[in-house]
Amino acid sequence: MTRFILLHIILFNFMKGGIQVQYDHLNIEVYETSAQGNKLNKINEFSKNINQILITIKPEETFQKIIGFGGSFTASSAFLLNTLSQENRNKILAAYFSEQGAKYSLTRTHINSCDFSLHNYAYSNIPNDKHLEHFSIDEDKKDIIPIIKDAITISKDGFKIIASPWTAPPWMKDNKDWRGGKLLPEFRNTWALYFSKYIKAYQQEGIKIWGLTVENEPLGNGNNWESMHYTPEEMTDFVENYLGPNLESAGLSYIKVLGYDQNRGDELVRWAEVMFKNKNTAKYFSGTAIHWYGSTYDYFPESLQRVHQLAPDKYLIQTEACIDGEVPKWKDDTWYWSKAAKDWGWTWAPENQKYLHPEYVPVFRYARDIIGCLNNYVNGWIDWNMVLDKQGGPNWANNWCTAPVIADTVNNEVYFTPLYYTIAHFSKFIRPGAVRIGFECLDNELMVTAVQNTDQTIAVIVFNPSVMEKVYQIAIKKENFNASIQPKSIQTIILKKLKPAI
Protein backbone atom coordinates (compact mmCIF):
# COMPACT_ATOMS: atom_id res chain seq x y z
CA MET A 1 0.00 0.00 0.00
CA THR A 2 1.25 3.44 -0.90
CA ARG A 3 1.64 5.45 2.28
CA PHE A 4 3.18 8.72 3.19
CA ILE A 5 3.45 8.97 6.98
CA LEU A 6 3.55 12.54 8.17
CA LEU A 7 4.20 13.00 11.87
CA HIS A 8 2.68 15.96 13.59
CA ILE A 9 4.74 17.82 16.09
CA ILE A 10 4.58 15.92 19.36
CA LEU A 11 2.17 17.43 21.83
CA PHE A 12 3.21 17.16 25.45
CA ASN A 13 0.47 17.10 28.04
CA PHE A 14 1.50 16.85 31.64
CA MET A 15 -1.07 14.74 33.43
CA LYS A 16 -0.73 13.39 36.94
CA GLY A 17 2.98 14.01 36.99
CA GLY A 18 3.65 12.12 33.75
CA ILE A 19 3.90 12.87 30.02
CA GLN A 20 1.16 11.81 27.56
CA VAL A 21 2.36 11.77 23.93
CA GLN A 22 -0.15 12.23 21.09
CA TYR A 23 0.43 12.43 17.35
CA ASP A 24 -1.44 11.99 14.11
CA HIS A 25 -0.50 9.83 11.16
CA LEU A 26 -1.71 10.98 7.76
CA ASN A 27 -2.20 7.95 5.55
CA ILE A 28 -2.27 8.94 1.88
CA GLU A 29 -3.16 6.78 -1.12
CA VAL A 30 -3.06 7.98 -4.72
CA TYR A 31 -4.87 6.26 -7.62
CA GLU A 32 -4.47 7.26 -11.25
CA THR A 33 -6.08 6.60 -14.64
CA SER A 34 -4.18 8.02 -17.58
CA ALA A 35 -3.85 8.10 -21.35
CA GLN A 36 -0.48 6.42 -20.80
CA GLY A 37 -2.20 3.28 -19.56
CA ASN A 38 -2.88 3.52 -15.84
CA LYS A 39 -6.30 2.19 -14.85
CA LEU A 40 -6.99 3.08 -11.23
CA ASN A 41 -3.39 2.14 -10.46
CA LYS A 42 -1.90 3.04 -7.09
CA ILE A 43 0.97 5.44 -7.62
CA ASN A 44 4.15 5.05 -5.56
CA GLU A 45 6.55 7.53 -7.11
CA PHE A 46 6.14 11.12 -8.20
CA SER A 47 8.14 13.68 -10.12
CA LYS A 48 9.66 16.61 -8.25
CA ASN A 49 9.75 20.24 -9.23
CA ILE A 50 10.50 23.35 -7.25
CA ASN A 51 7.58 25.11 -8.98
CA GLN A 52 4.72 23.21 -7.39
CA ILE A 53 1.02 23.94 -7.82
CA LEU A 54 -0.56 24.53 -4.43
CA ILE A 55 -3.90 22.81 -3.75
CA THR A 56 -5.28 23.82 -0.36
CA ILE A 57 -8.02 21.66 1.17
CA LYS A 58 -10.47 23.43 3.49
CA PRO A 59 -12.58 20.89 5.43
CA GLU A 60 -14.08 23.68 7.52
CA GLU A 61 -15.97 24.87 4.41
CA THR A 62 -18.88 22.52 3.74
CA PHE A 63 -21.41 22.34 0.92
CA GLN A 64 -23.91 19.73 -0.33
CA LYS A 65 -24.24 16.12 0.79
CA ILE A 66 -23.48 13.45 -1.82
CA ILE A 67 -25.92 10.56 -2.30
CA GLY A 68 -23.97 8.55 -4.85
CA PHE A 69 -22.70 7.72 -8.32
CA GLY A 70 -23.60 4.96 -10.75
CA GLY A 71 -25.28 3.85 -13.95
CA SER A 72 -28.58 2.58 -15.31
CA PHE A 73 -30.34 -0.77 -15.47
CA THR A 74 -31.79 -0.70 -18.98
CA ALA A 75 -33.52 -3.57 -20.76
CA SER A 76 -30.72 -3.59 -23.33
CA SER A 77 -27.96 -3.84 -20.73
CA ALA A 78 -29.83 -6.53 -18.81
CA PHE A 79 -30.45 -8.53 -22.00
CA LEU A 80 -26.76 -8.43 -22.90
CA LEU A 81 -25.70 -9.47 -19.41
CA ASN A 82 -28.02 -12.46 -19.60
CA THR A 83 -26.67 -13.33 -23.06
CA LEU A 84 -23.04 -13.48 -21.92
CA SER A 85 -21.51 -16.44 -20.12
CA GLN A 86 -22.16 -16.64 -16.39
CA GLU A 87 -18.50 -15.83 -15.80
CA ASN A 88 -18.57 -12.60 -17.79
CA ARG A 89 -21.99 -11.65 -16.46
CA ASN A 90 -20.72 -11.96 -12.90
CA LYS A 91 -17.47 -10.21 -13.81
CA ILE A 92 -19.32 -7.12 -15.04
CA LEU A 93 -21.75 -6.96 -12.12
CA ALA A 94 -18.88 -7.36 -9.66
CA ALA A 95 -16.93 -4.64 -11.47
CA TYR A 96 -19.81 -2.23 -10.94
CA PHE A 97 -21.14 -3.21 -7.51
CA SER A 98 -18.59 -5.15 -5.45
CA GLU A 99 -16.18 -3.80 -2.85
CA GLN A 100 -13.32 -4.57 -5.23
CA GLY A 101 -15.10 -2.79 -8.09
CA ALA A 102 -16.60 0.65 -8.64
CA LYS A 103 -19.07 0.32 -5.72
CA TYR A 104 -21.98 1.97 -7.56
CA SER A 105 -24.37 3.53 -5.06
CA LEU A 106 -26.94 5.42 -7.18
CA THR A 107 -28.71 3.91 -10.19
CA ARG A 108 -31.61 4.46 -12.55
CA THR A 109 -34.05 2.31 -14.49
CA HIS A 110 -37.01 2.90 -16.79
CA ILE A 111 -40.75 2.49 -16.22
CA ASN A 112 -42.24 0.87 -19.35
CA SER A 113 -39.94 0.63 -22.37
CA CYS A 114 -37.40 3.17 -23.59
CA ASP A 115 -35.23 3.32 -26.69
CA PHE A 116 -32.76 0.98 -24.98
CA SER A 117 -35.36 -1.78 -24.93
CA LEU A 118 -35.75 -4.57 -27.46
CA HIS A 119 -39.29 -3.41 -28.30
CA ASN A 120 -42.09 -1.13 -27.09
CA TYR A 121 -43.97 -2.32 -24.02
CA ALA A 122 -46.06 -1.09 -21.12
CA TYR A 123 -47.29 -2.73 -17.92
CA SER A 124 -50.94 -2.16 -18.85
CA ASN A 125 -52.00 -2.64 -22.47
CA ILE A 126 -55.77 -2.78 -21.99
CA PRO A 127 -57.36 0.51 -23.15
CA ASN A 128 -59.44 2.42 -20.60
CA ASP A 129 -58.24 0.22 -17.73
CA LYS A 130 -58.54 3.18 -15.37
CA HIS A 131 -58.03 1.12 -12.22
CA LEU A 132 -55.12 -0.81 -13.75
CA GLU A 133 -56.63 -4.19 -13.01
CA HIS A 134 -54.40 -5.72 -15.70
CA PHE A 135 -51.15 -4.12 -14.49
CA SER A 136 -48.16 -6.49 -14.70
CA ILE A 137 -44.36 -6.11 -14.65
CA ASP A 138 -43.81 -9.53 -16.25
CA GLU A 139 -41.80 -7.93 -19.08
CA ASP A 140 -39.21 -6.73 -16.56
CA LYS A 141 -38.96 -10.19 -14.99
CA LYS A 142 -37.19 -11.48 -18.10
CA ASP A 143 -33.97 -9.48 -17.71
CA ILE A 144 -34.07 -6.24 -15.69
CA ILE A 145 -35.34 -7.62 -12.38
CA PRO A 146 -32.95 -10.63 -12.26
CA ILE A 147 -29.99 -8.34 -12.95
CA ILE A 148 -31.03 -5.85 -10.25
CA LYS A 149 -31.45 -8.70 -7.77
CA ASP A 150 -27.97 -10.01 -8.52
CA ALA A 151 -26.52 -6.51 -8.14
CA ILE A 152 -28.23 -6.18 -4.76
CA THR A 153 -26.65 -9.46 -3.65
CA ILE A 154 -23.19 -8.31 -4.74
CA SER A 155 -23.36 -4.79 -3.25
CA LYS A 156 -22.22 -4.61 0.37
CA ASP A 157 -23.70 -1.18 1.12
CA GLY A 158 -26.63 -1.37 -1.30
CA PHE A 159 -27.63 1.29 -3.80
CA LYS A 160 -30.50 3.64 -4.53
CA ILE A 161 -32.72 3.25 -7.60
CA ILE A 162 -34.45 6.10 -9.42
CA ALA A 163 -37.18 5.01 -11.86
CA SER A 164 -38.20 7.13 -14.87
CA PRO A 165 -40.98 6.71 -17.44
CA TRP A 166 -40.33 7.65 -21.05
CA THR A 167 -44.05 7.53 -21.79
CA ALA A 168 -47.43 6.45 -20.49
CA PRO A 169 -49.13 3.63 -22.43
CA PRO A 170 -50.37 5.03 -25.77
CA TRP A 171 -54.01 4.56 -24.79
CA MET A 172 -53.57 7.24 -22.11
CA LYS A 173 -52.23 9.82 -24.59
CA ASP A 174 -53.82 12.26 -26.97
CA ASN A 175 -51.95 10.92 -30.03
CA LYS A 176 -52.26 7.19 -29.16
CA ASP A 177 -48.56 6.77 -29.97
CA TRP A 178 -45.46 5.72 -28.04
CA ARG A 179 -43.71 8.84 -29.31
CA GLY A 180 -44.64 12.41 -28.43
CA GLY A 181 -48.09 13.54 -27.44
CA LYS A 182 -49.47 14.41 -24.04
CA LEU A 183 -51.25 12.67 -21.20
CA LEU A 184 -55.03 12.99 -21.55
CA PRO A 185 -56.62 14.82 -18.59
CA GLU A 186 -59.02 11.94 -17.91
CA PHE A 187 -56.06 9.61 -17.24
CA ARG A 188 -54.10 11.77 -14.80
CA ASN A 189 -55.31 9.80 -11.78
CA THR A 190 -54.67 6.54 -13.61
CA TRP A 191 -51.14 7.56 -14.53
CA ALA A 192 -50.45 8.61 -10.93
CA LEU A 193 -51.73 5.22 -9.77
CA TYR A 194 -49.40 3.59 -12.32
CA PHE A 195 -46.35 4.85 -10.39
CA SER A 196 -47.65 3.43 -7.11
CA LYS A 197 -48.44 0.09 -8.74
CA TYR A 198 -44.93 -0.05 -10.18
CA ILE A 199 -43.23 0.71 -6.85
CA LYS A 200 -45.28 -1.90 -4.99
CA ALA A 201 -44.77 -4.52 -7.70
CA TYR A 202 -41.02 -4.04 -7.45
CA GLN A 203 -41.23 -4.20 -3.66
CA GLN A 204 -42.82 -7.63 -4.00
CA GLU A 205 -39.74 -8.65 -5.98
CA GLY A 206 -37.50 -7.50 -3.13
CA ILE A 207 -36.43 -4.31 -4.92
CA LYS A 208 -36.88 -0.96 -3.21
CA ILE A 209 -37.34 2.10 -5.40
CA TRP A 210 -35.80 5.20 -3.81
CA GLY A 211 -37.07 7.86 -6.17
CA LEU A 212 -38.89 8.78 -9.36
CA THR A 213 -38.54 11.29 -12.11
CA VAL A 214 -41.92 12.38 -13.43
CA GLU A 215 -40.94 12.11 -17.09
CA ASN A 216 -37.72 11.50 -18.98
CA GLU A 217 -37.03 14.49 -21.22
CA PRO A 218 -40.44 16.20 -21.07
CA LEU A 219 -39.37 18.61 -23.82
CA GLY A 220 -39.21 15.65 -26.20
CA ASN A 221 -36.64 13.93 -28.38
CA GLY A 222 -37.89 14.77 -31.85
CA ASN A 223 -40.45 11.95 -31.64
CA ASN A 224 -37.74 9.40 -32.44
CA TRP A 225 -38.52 7.00 -29.58
CA GLU A 226 -40.72 6.80 -26.48
CA SER A 227 -41.59 10.22 -25.10
CA MET A 228 -44.41 12.27 -23.60
CA HIS A 229 -44.48 16.04 -23.42
CA TYR A 230 -45.09 18.39 -20.49
CA THR A 231 -44.74 22.09 -19.95
CA PRO A 232 -43.30 23.04 -16.54
CA GLU A 233 -46.79 24.14 -15.48
CA GLU A 234 -48.34 20.82 -16.57
CA MET A 235 -45.75 18.72 -14.76
CA THR A 236 -46.03 20.82 -11.61
CA ASP A 237 -49.83 20.50 -11.66
CA PHE A 238 -49.58 16.73 -12.15
CA VAL A 239 -47.23 16.34 -9.19
CA GLU A 240 -49.12 18.76 -6.93
CA ASN A 241 -52.62 17.41 -7.56
CA TYR A 242 -52.20 13.81 -8.71
CA LEU A 243 -48.86 12.06 -8.25
CA GLY A 244 -47.95 13.51 -4.86
CA PRO A 245 -51.34 12.87 -3.23
CA ASN A 246 -51.49 9.37 -4.76
CA LEU A 247 -48.10 8.39 -3.36
CA GLU A 248 -49.12 9.82 0.00
CA SER A 249 -52.40 7.89 0.15
CA ALA A 250 -50.59 4.71 -0.92
CA GLY A 251 -48.16 4.97 1.98
CA LEU A 252 -45.32 5.89 -0.36
CA SER A 253 -44.64 9.45 0.76
CA TYR A 254 -41.00 8.50 1.38
CA ILE A 255 -40.45 8.20 -2.38
CA LYS A 256 -38.33 11.06 -3.73
CA VAL A 257 -40.00 12.84 -6.67
CA LEU A 258 -37.66 14.66 -9.06
CA GLY A 259 -38.94 17.11 -11.65
CA TYR A 260 -37.72 18.20 -15.08
CA ASP A 261 -35.18 15.47 -16.15
CA GLN A 262 -33.63 17.07 -19.20
CA ASN A 263 -30.70 19.32 -20.14
CA ARG A 264 -29.13 22.13 -18.13
CA GLY A 265 -29.15 25.78 -19.06
CA ASP A 266 -31.99 28.28 -19.40
CA GLU A 267 -34.72 25.61 -19.65
CA LEU A 268 -33.59 24.07 -16.36
CA VAL A 269 -33.91 27.42 -14.61
CA ARG A 270 -37.34 28.08 -16.15
CA TRP A 271 -38.65 24.73 -14.93
CA ALA A 272 -37.20 25.17 -11.45
CA GLU A 273 -38.82 28.59 -11.14
CA VAL A 274 -42.22 27.01 -11.79
CA MET A 275 -41.67 23.88 -9.67
CA PHE A 276 -40.44 25.81 -6.64
CA LYS A 277 -42.66 28.86 -7.08
CA ASN A 278 -44.33 28.46 -3.68
CA LYS A 279 -44.89 25.93 -0.90
CA ASN A 280 -47.81 24.28 -2.66
CA THR A 281 -46.00 23.71 -5.95
CA ALA A 282 -42.81 22.57 -4.19
CA LYS A 283 -44.48 20.35 -1.59
CA TYR A 284 -44.12 17.00 -3.36
CA PHE A 285 -40.94 17.72 -5.29
CA SER A 286 -37.83 16.34 -3.62
CA GLY A 287 -35.58 17.92 -6.20
CA THR A 288 -34.60 18.31 -9.83
CA ALA A 289 -33.17 15.80 -12.32
CA ILE A 290 -30.83 16.91 -15.09
CA HIS A 291 -29.04 15.55 -18.20
CA TRP A 292 -25.79 16.60 -19.86
CA TYR A 293 -26.71 16.70 -23.57
CA GLY A 294 -26.85 20.50 -23.84
CA SER A 295 -23.13 20.70 -24.63
CA THR A 296 -20.05 18.55 -25.04
CA TYR A 297 -17.95 20.83 -22.82
CA ASP A 298 -20.16 23.25 -20.84
CA TYR A 299 -21.68 21.93 -17.61
CA PHE A 300 -23.71 25.16 -17.22
CA PRO A 301 -22.61 26.13 -13.69
CA GLU A 302 -24.77 29.25 -13.61
CA SER A 303 -27.97 27.26 -14.09
CA LEU A 304 -26.93 24.72 -11.44
CA GLN A 305 -26.19 27.50 -8.97
CA ARG A 306 -29.50 29.19 -9.72
CA VAL A 307 -31.49 26.01 -9.07
CA HIS A 308 -29.65 25.56 -5.79
CA GLN A 309 -30.58 29.12 -4.84
CA LEU A 310 -34.23 28.49 -5.70
CA ALA A 311 -34.39 25.24 -3.70
CA PRO A 312 -31.36 24.88 -1.41
CA ASP A 313 -33.02 22.10 0.58
CA LYS A 314 -33.88 19.99 -2.50
CA TYR A 315 -31.85 17.43 -4.42
CA LEU A 316 -30.11 18.23 -7.70
CA ILE A 317 -29.30 14.94 -9.42
CA GLN A 318 -27.66 14.23 -12.77
CA THR A 319 -29.70 11.26 -14.05
CA GLU A 320 -28.37 10.59 -17.56
CA ALA A 321 -25.16 10.98 -19.55
CA CYS A 322 -23.48 9.00 -22.31
CA ILE A 323 -21.38 9.17 -25.45
CA ASP A 324 -24.30 9.37 -27.85
CA GLY A 325 -22.82 7.69 -30.89
CA GLU A 326 -21.93 4.23 -32.15
CA VAL A 327 -19.08 2.37 -30.47
CA PRO A 328 -16.13 3.53 -32.62
CA LYS A 329 -13.57 0.77 -32.14
CA TRP A 330 -13.23 -2.48 -30.25
CA LYS A 331 -10.67 -2.53 -27.43
CA ASP A 332 -9.04 0.75 -28.42
CA ASP A 333 -8.34 2.85 -25.33
CA THR A 334 -6.67 5.54 -27.44
CA TRP A 335 -9.96 6.71 -28.95
CA TYR A 336 -11.40 7.53 -25.51
CA TRP A 337 -8.44 9.82 -24.84
CA SER A 338 -8.62 11.49 -28.29
CA LYS A 339 -10.60 14.48 -29.52
CA ALA A 340 -12.63 12.36 -31.92
CA ALA A 341 -16.15 12.02 -30.48
CA LYS A 342 -19.21 13.84 -31.81
CA ASP A 343 -22.63 14.14 -30.18
CA TRP A 344 -26.14 14.64 -31.58
CA GLY A 345 -25.64 18.39 -31.73
CA TRP A 346 -22.77 18.13 -34.22
CA THR A 347 -25.40 17.38 -36.86
CA TRP A 348 -28.77 18.36 -35.43
CA ALA A 349 -28.27 21.37 -33.16
CA PRO A 350 -29.61 24.72 -34.45
CA GLU A 351 -26.90 26.85 -36.06
CA ASN A 352 -26.90 29.31 -33.16
CA GLN A 353 -26.15 26.45 -30.73
CA LYS A 354 -23.59 24.43 -32.69
CA TYR A 355 -20.76 26.13 -30.81
CA LEU A 356 -21.90 24.13 -27.77
CA HIS A 357 -21.26 20.82 -29.56
CA PRO A 358 -17.67 20.63 -30.82
CA GLU A 359 -15.73 17.38 -31.11
CA TYR A 360 -14.49 16.24 -27.72
CA VAL A 361 -12.38 13.78 -25.74
CA PRO A 362 -14.73 11.22 -24.10
CA VAL A 363 -12.74 10.80 -20.87
CA PHE A 364 -12.33 14.56 -20.55
CA ARG A 365 -16.06 15.13 -20.96
CA TYR A 366 -16.87 12.67 -18.17
CA ALA A 367 -14.24 13.95 -15.73
CA ARG A 368 -15.01 17.61 -16.43
CA ASP A 369 -18.74 17.13 -16.07
CA ILE A 370 -18.67 15.14 -12.84
CA ILE A 371 -16.25 17.56 -11.19
CA GLY A 372 -18.17 20.55 -12.54
CA CYS A 373 -21.43 19.14 -11.20
CA LEU A 374 -19.99 18.42 -7.77
CA ASN A 375 -18.55 21.91 -7.52
CA ASN A 376 -21.98 23.37 -8.30
CA TYR A 377 -24.26 21.63 -5.77
CA VAL A 378 -25.16 18.42 -7.60
CA ASN A 379 -25.85 15.61 -5.09
CA GLY A 380 -25.51 12.58 -7.35
CA TRP A 381 -24.40 11.60 -10.85
CA ILE A 382 -25.77 8.70 -12.93
CA ASP A 383 -24.41 7.38 -16.21
CA TRP A 384 -26.70 5.81 -18.83
CA ASN A 385 -26.36 2.16 -19.99
CA MET A 386 -23.92 0.02 -18.02
CA VAL A 387 -23.32 -2.41 -20.89
CA LEU A 388 -23.86 -2.17 -24.66
CA ASP A 389 -22.82 -4.29 -27.64
CA LYS A 390 -20.14 -3.54 -30.23
CA GLN A 391 -22.51 -1.34 -32.23
CA GLY A 392 -23.92 0.57 -29.28
CA GLY A 393 -27.18 -1.27 -28.77
CA PRO A 394 -29.45 -3.11 -28.81
CA ASN A 395 -31.73 -0.16 -29.40
CA TRP A 396 -35.05 -0.56 -31.19
CA ALA A 397 -34.85 3.04 -32.49
CA ASN A 398 -31.26 2.67 -33.77
CA ASN A 399 -30.17 5.37 -31.31
CA TRP A 400 -26.70 3.90 -30.81
CA CYS A 401 -24.61 4.99 -27.82
CA THR A 402 -21.40 4.00 -26.06
CA ALA A 403 -21.25 2.51 -22.56
CA PRO A 404 -18.39 2.12 -20.06
CA VAL A 405 -18.46 -1.64 -20.70
CA ILE A 406 -18.82 -3.10 -24.20
CA ALA A 407 -19.83 -6.73 -24.75
CA ASP A 408 -19.17 -8.97 -27.75
CA THR A 409 -21.88 -11.58 -27.27
CA VAL A 410 -20.86 -13.56 -30.36
CA ASN A 411 -17.35 -14.25 -29.05
CA ASN A 412 -18.26 -13.85 -25.35
CA GLU A 413 -15.74 -11.05 -24.78
CA VAL A 414 -15.92 -7.96 -22.59
CA TYR A 415 -14.12 -4.61 -22.91
CA PHE A 416 -13.85 -2.23 -19.96
CA THR A 417 -13.36 1.16 -21.60
CA PRO A 418 -11.51 4.08 -19.93
CA LEU A 419 -14.95 5.52 -19.11
CA TYR A 420 -15.47 2.74 -16.56
CA TYR A 421 -12.31 3.72 -14.68
CA THR A 422 -13.14 7.42 -14.95
CA ILE A 423 -16.49 7.00 -13.18
CA ALA A 424 -14.92 4.64 -10.63
CA HIS A 425 -12.57 7.43 -9.52
CA PHE A 426 -15.68 9.02 -8.02
CA SER A 427 -18.05 6.15 -7.21
CA LYS A 428 -15.47 4.00 -5.42
CA PHE A 429 -14.03 6.70 -3.20
CA ILE A 430 -16.85 9.22 -2.66
CA ARG A 431 -19.43 7.36 -0.63
CA PRO A 432 -23.08 8.18 0.17
CA GLY A 433 -23.27 10.75 2.94
CA ALA A 434 -20.02 12.44 1.97
CA VAL A 435 -19.99 16.24 2.11
CA ARG A 436 -18.26 18.41 -0.44
CA ILE A 437 -15.64 20.60 1.19
CA GLY A 438 -13.75 23.69 0.15
CA PHE A 439 -10.48 23.88 -1.75
CA GLU A 440 -8.29 26.34 -3.59
CA CYS A 441 -6.20 25.39 -6.62
CA LEU A 442 -3.70 27.87 -8.03
CA ASP A 443 -3.72 26.48 -11.57
CA ASN A 444 -6.01 27.28 -14.49
CA GLU A 445 -5.74 23.88 -16.18
CA LEU A 446 -6.28 21.42 -13.34
CA MET A 447 -9.84 20.67 -12.24
CA VAL A 448 -10.25 19.72 -8.59
CA THR A 449 -12.97 18.73 -6.17
CA ALA A 450 -12.86 17.46 -2.60
CA VAL A 451 -15.21 15.70 -0.19
CA GLN A 452 -15.14 14.35 3.33
CA ASN A 453 -16.69 10.90 3.76
CA THR A 454 -18.65 9.81 6.81
CA ASP A 455 -15.61 7.81 8.01
CA GLN A 456 -13.68 11.13 8.02
CA THR A 457 -11.48 10.20 5.07
CA ILE A 458 -11.02 12.99 2.57
CA ALA A 459 -11.14 12.27 -1.16
CA VAL A 460 -9.56 14.76 -3.53
CA ILE A 461 -10.08 14.34 -7.28
CA VAL A 462 -7.55 15.98 -9.60
CA PHE A 463 -8.08 16.03 -13.38
CA ASN A 464 -5.26 17.10 -15.69
CA PRO A 465 -6.45 17.54 -19.31
CA SER A 466 -3.24 19.23 -20.40
CA VAL A 467 -0.36 17.66 -22.35
CA MET A 468 2.07 18.55 -19.56
CA GLU A 469 2.79 16.72 -16.34
CA LYS A 470 1.86 18.76 -13.26
CA VAL A 471 3.70 18.72 -9.94
CA TYR A 472 1.54 19.80 -7.02
CA GLN A 473 1.41 20.07 -3.26
CA ILE A 474 -1.73 19.34 -1.27
CA ALA A 475 -1.98 21.30 1.96
CA ILE A 476 -4.53 20.59 4.67
CA LYS A 477 -4.30 22.54 7.90
CA LYS A 478 -0.66 22.21 9.01
CA GLU A 479 0.14 19.19 6.89
CA ASN A 480 1.11 18.81 3.27
CA PHE A 481 2.45 16.32 0.77
CA ASN A 482 3.94 16.55 -2.68
CA ALA A 483 2.90 14.59 -5.75
CA SER A 484 2.58 14.80 -9.52
CA ILE A 485 -0.04 13.93 -12.12
CA GLN A 486 0.66 12.74 -15.64
CA PRO A 487 -0.68 14.56 -18.70
CA LYS A 488 -4.19 13.52 -19.70
CA SER A 489 -5.01 11.79 -16.44
CA ILE A 490 -7.27 11.64 -13.40
CA GLN A 491 -6.22 11.03 -9.82
CA THR A 492 -8.08 10.28 -6.62
CA ILE A 493 -6.11 11.09 -3.48
CA ILE A 494 -7.37 9.58 -0.21
CA LEU A 495 -6.31 11.25 3.03
CA LYS A 496 -6.96 9.41 6.25
CA LYS A 497 -5.80 10.37 9.70
CA LEU A 498 -4.99 7.64 12.19
CA LYS A 499 -4.42 8.09 15.91
CA PRO A 500 -2.55 5.07 17.26
CA ALA A 501 -2.78 4.32 20.94
CA ILE A 502 0.43 4.94 22.89
Question: How would you label these PLM feature ranges?
Answer:
Residues 318-421, 438-441:
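Aromatic/acidic polysaccharide-binding cleft in carbohydrate-active enzymes
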Residues 190-208, 218-329:
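Active-site neighborhood of glycoside hydrolase catalytic domains
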Residues 71, 103, 161, 212, ...:
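Conserved, mostly hydrophobic/aromatic
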Residues 36-209, 230-233, 241:
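N-terminal catalytic cores of secreted or lumenal carbohydrate-active enzymes
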